[in-house]
């Protein structure tokens, strides 16, 4: 037991960087991974999980313009290809569906641009 107490004391004195290095060394030596084990879902829950994972198309909903309304209107105009009047109308009518059937990567990019302009956006 005294040996274990010494080991515990030594491990407690390690810095975060030293502890991470120790973990890597032990993983290599013992051919293991320190990653948390993934629980296997029950058979009945699997189809629901697959349905969520398969979602590839999203709707972009403009929730609110925020404080920078002019910048949001410009961003909406650029993203949708609408004219200035139509883009302003869309922003004024928020919450409003902006685009639908958008791939995940494109939806995330559009959301980022709108949020950078000051808008509040939701992906559905």
UniProtKB/Swiss-Prot annotation:
<keyword id="KW-0689">Ribosomal protein</keyword>
<dbReference type="InterPro" id="IPR036235">
    <property type="entry name" value="Ribosomal_bL12_oligo_N_sf"/>
</dbReference>
<dbReference type="GO" id="GO:0005840">
    <property type="term" value="C:ribosome"/>
</dbReference>
<dbReference type="GO" id="GO:0005737">
    <property type="term" value="C:cytoplasm"/>
</dbReference>
<dbReference type="InterPro" id="IPR013823">
    <property type="entry name" value="Ribosomal_bL12_C"/>
</dbReference>
<comment type="similarity">
    <text>Belongs to the bacterial ribosomal protein bL12 family.</text>
</comment>
<dbReference type="GO" id="GO:0003735">
    <property type="term" value="F:structural constituent of ribosome"/>
</dbReference>
<comment type="subunit">
    <text>Homodimer. Part of the ribosomal stalk of the 50S ribosomal subunit. Forms a multimeric L10(L12)X complex, where L10 forms an elongated spine to which 2 to 4 L12 dimers bind in a sequential fashion. Binds GTP-bound translation factors.</text>
</comment>
<keyword id="KW-0687">Ribonucleoprotein</keyword>
<comment type="function">
    <text>Forms part of the ribosomal stalk which helps the ribosome interact with GTP-bound translation factors. Is thus essential for accurate translation.</text>
</comment>
<dbReference type="GO" id="GO:0003729">
    <property type="term" value="F:mRNA binding"/>
</dbReference>
<dbReference type="Pfam" id="PF00542">
    <property type="entry name" value="Ribosomal_L12"/>
</dbReference>
<dbReference type="Pfam" id="PF16320">
    <property type="entry name" value="Ribosomal_L12_N"/>
</dbReference>
<dbReference type="GO" id="GO:1990904">
    <property type="term" value="C:ribonucleoprotein complex"/>
</dbReference>
<protein>
    <recommendedName>
        <fullName>Large ribosomal subunit protein bL12</fullName>
    </recommendedName>
</protein>
<dbReference type="InterPro" id="IPR000206">
    <property type="entry name" value="Ribosomal_bL12"/>
</dbReference>
<dbReference type="InterPro" id="IPR014719">
    <property type="entry name" value="Ribosomal_bL12_C/ClpS-like"/>
</dbReference>
<dbReference type="InterPro" id="IPR008932">
    <property type="entry name" value="Ribosomal_bL12_oligo"/>
</dbReference>
<dbReference type="GO" id="GO:0006412">
    <property type="term" value="P:translation"/>
</dbReference>
């Amino acid at each position: 037991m005294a040996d274990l107490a010494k080991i515990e004391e030594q491990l407690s004195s390690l810095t975060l960087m030293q502890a991470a290095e120790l973990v890597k060394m032990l993983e290599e030596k013992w051919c293991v991974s320190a990653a948390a084990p993934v629980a296997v879902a029950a058979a009945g829950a699997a189809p629901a999980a697959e349905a969520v994972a398969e979602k590839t198309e999203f709707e972009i909903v403009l929730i609110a313009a925020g404080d920078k309304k002019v910048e949001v209107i410009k961003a909406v105009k650029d993203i949708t290809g609408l004219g200035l009047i139509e883009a302003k109308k869309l922003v004024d009518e928020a919450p409003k569906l902006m685009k639908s059937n958008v791939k995940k990567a494109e939806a995330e990019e559009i959301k980022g641009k709108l949020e950078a302009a000051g808008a509040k956006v939701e992906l559905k």
